[in-house]
From Swiss-Prot:
Keywords: Cytoplasm, FAD, Flavoprotein, NAD, tRNA processing. NAD(+) binds at residues 267-281. It is found in: Cytoplasm. One of its GO terms (biological process) is tRNA wobble uridine modification. This is tRNA uridine 5-carboxymethylaminomethyl modification enzyme MnmG.
Length: 600
């Protein structure tokens, strides 16, 4: 009887990170239906963006894969929100779609501690000794101490093209027919969610001269550092819907399975279909769309923002109402997919089932959307599964430490009634958990977890020692009656501007270190206030709410007032864990408690 410490089911972004992380501890089996699909980007050919790049930087700092794969296959990089503060600046990397999957397969298939097992998981059984048996559809029984289930959109998956449906997990791939049953048998309540993907259009049928070109940033950036020169680059482009697009959709809503009532699953609020945009935002006369190449020498482009479940013949008409797409030929049609998800409040903060110990879940199965959210969960689940299999202590990544901590905390304590997407607005202390300091924050955590080796920890520590040296150097240099750091704190001046005034930094500082110096000096006051607020909130969360009349606190949102009155939490910490109670509501509670103390 062959066994492993961990079996990972599914080779998407969550499964990749889970297998990679678990393999740092012991031998792992990666069970996939078709190894050729491992690491595929089934939706947009890009990584990062607001709220998402921060997760990728954190995964990278924890020893994960996604940032490295994205950098290795990048064809276009842009820093989004570059004109805003560092708390919301977010890297977005456009990737060569096929190359990304090929690179992922090279890394995973070449790993000495990861065994690729081909087959379909048909059942999950507890072995009576704290371990698990994965039963395949051809009758094999695979034994492991822990299992990570990362089934994506495949569990009882159904794709929709207009009113026609097919049993698929995604286009052309069969669903997971059996895995929902053992979860339900074990007491899990499953929900149905829905997502969608846009059409892919033949690149040679698009008039790119009629589109707005979006060039890459002049200086390429990456998740793993400053990348070297690329073999090839490509711009992206922008177009938009027209009144003709909107009219055609309105006239044919009866052919949408969502509006006809065929689809039961809840769709993503922050990534709506083009039908939803036209119906829910009818006051807009156009919606921006982004045209993204699948690669430099690609034969097709991806129409970001145009996901749809309308029938193919209508998609042909709709796409040709867009500027630059009048002669467009669709190579692969858009579709919606409906699938099972677990209730994430039935998981621990390490994504282990509270009902089925030793079973971990990650990715879209947990009700999230997006590659980045999936990768982050996969790393957590794979690490926790491996540590459990070896009898090691649990380690929890706290909400205050990272975007990853917020993601876990939201899933477990708040849950979601729709596909969850990470955004900067979900993070209370985002000035402290920026993408630029992810390595400083997360590398020590990765080292403590066993994911990062001593050499990497020392490298990061030495990097930030150089950063501190640079900051100290600026504080000692005077120009025109002021220190260099005082000049740098002026909002209109950059570090380069201050250097033209005569300031110098140690020559050994690299680009990322210079950026860290600039951010820490320029935003020193804001950062200090945020740190003070975080310390105050940590103390405040221990405050008692016993006897508080929540119904009488008018500053609370209606939802928070109703839930607090019904659930009667005894501490601020407990109140903050209730779904629908937001950071603003907690602040209102703290103001109320302070007023009570003053009044008494």
């Amino acid at each position: 009887m062959k066994g492993w410490n961990v079996i990972v089911i599914g080779g998407g972004h969550a499964g990749l990170e889970a297998a990679w992380a678990a393999a740092k501890f012991s031998r792992v089996a990666l069970l996939v239906g078709n190894p050729a699909t491992v690491g595929r980007m089934p939706c947009n050919p890009a990584v990062g963006g607001p709220g998402k790049s921060q997760l990728v930087f954190e995964v990278q700092a924890l020893g994960g894969l996604m940032g490295r794969l994205a950098d290795d296959t990048a064809i276009h990089t842009r820093m989004l929100n570059a004109s805003k503060g560092p708390a919301v600046q977010s890297l977005r990397v456009q990737n060569e779609r096929d190359a990304y999957a090929e690179r992922a397969q090279d890394v995973i298939f070449g790993h000495s501690e990861i065994e690729i097992v081909r087959g379909e998981a048909a059942d999950l059984e507890q072995d009576g000794q704290g371990g698990w048996v994965v039963v395949t559809s051809d009758g094999r029984r695979l034994h492991a101490r822990s299992v990570v289930l990362a089934a994506g959109t495949f569990m009882r998956g159904v794709t929709w093209y207009g009113r026609q449906s097919r049993p698929e997990g995604r286009q052309g791939e069969p669903p997971s027919r059996f895995l929902s049953a053992p979860l339900e048998r074990g007491g899990h309540v499953l929900k149905r969610y829905k997502t969608g993907t846009p059409p892919r259009v033949r690149a040679d049928s698009v008039r790119f001269a009629d589109l707005l070109e979006i060039p890459a940033d002049p200086q390429p950036r990456g998740f793993t550092g400053t990348p070297g020169p690329r073999a090839a680059e490509s711009p992206t482009w922008q177009t938009h819907t027209t009144p003709q697009t909107h009219a055609l959709i309105q006239e044919n809503l009866h052919e949408s399975p969502m509006y006809a009532g065929d689809i039961e699953g809840l769709g993503p609020r922050y990534c709506p279909s083009i039908e939803d945009k036209v119906v829910k935002f009818a006051h807009h006369d156009r919606h921006l769309l982004f045209v993204e190449p699948d690669g430099v020498q690609t034969s097709e482009v991806y129409l970001q923002g145009f996901s749809s479940s309308l029938p193919p013949r209508l998609q042909d008409e709709l796409v040709r109402t867009l500027p630059g797409f009048e002669q467009a030929v669709i190579q692969r049609y858009a579709y919606a997919v409906e699938y099972d998800v677990v209730d994430s409040t039935e998981l621990t903060l390490n994504l282990e089932s509270k009902k089925l110990p030793g079973l971990f879940t990650a990715g879209q199965l947990n009700g999230t959307s997006g590659y980045e959210e999936a990768a982050a969960q996969g790393l957590v689940a794979g690490t926790a599964a491996a540590r459990r299999s070896l009898g090691l202590d649990e380690q929890v990544i706290g909400r205050e430490t990272s975007y990853l901590g917020v993601l876990l905390d939201d899933l477990v304590f708040k849950g979601s009634d729709e596909p969850y997407r990470m955004m900067t607005s979900r993070v209370e202390h985002r000035l402290l958990v920026r993408q630029d300091n992810a390595d400083e924050r997360m590398t020590p955590i990765g080292h403590a977890l066993g994911l990062v080796d001593d050499a990497e920890l020392i490298r990061v520590q030495e990097k930030y020692a150089r950063v501190q040296s640079g900051i100290k150097s600026l504080s000692k240099q005077r120009m025109q009656g002021q220190t260099a750091d005082a000049w740098l704190r002026r909002p209109e001046l950059s570090l380069a501007d201050v250097e033209t005034l005569g300031a110098t930094l140690p020559a050994e500082l690299g680009a990322s270190e210079r950026e860290a110096v600039e951010i820490r000096v320029k935003y020193a006051g804001y950062i200090a206030r945020a740190e003070s607020q975080l310390r105050s909130e940590a103390k405040a969360r221990e405050l008692s709410l016993s006897g508080v009349n929540f119904a009488g606190i008018t500053a609370l949102s209606n939802e928070a007032r109703e839930k607090l009155t019904r659930l009667q939490p005894q501490t601020v910490e407990q109140a903050s864990r209730i779904s629908g109670v937001r950071h603003a509501d907690i602040s209102a509670l703290l103001v109320h408690l302070k007023g009570q103390r003053v009044g008494s």
